[in-house]
Amino acid sequence: MRPTRYIDPHIHMISRTTDDYQRMAFAGCEAISEPAFWAGFDRGTAEGFRDYFRHLTLVEPKRAAQYGNRHYSWLCINAKEAENVGLSRDVIAMIPQFLASPACWASARSA
């Protein structure tokens, strides 16, 4: 019997191994939605966010695809980090360059 197919609406895969992608696919997961999150420390530069957003929109979709999963991401700056107004403005200004990525939820919704 084939498992029930499902979408995981909120999971942080950046901190997981590819074994988890494999297990999720075996269990019937077909798509993953990964929100950006606070890393446990405040990122100090917009470039740190750029690297993180690249990982969410380029690396994770490739890892997920190895097991037949689609990976989508939500890009944002966490409220805790947003206390630094200058950093917040820089991060928010860079987000549009990632919106065209097929792995970005905004792009997937407009298709």
Residue ranges of model-derived segments:
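Mid-domain alpha/beta scaffold segments of enzyme catalytic cores
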Residues: 1-111
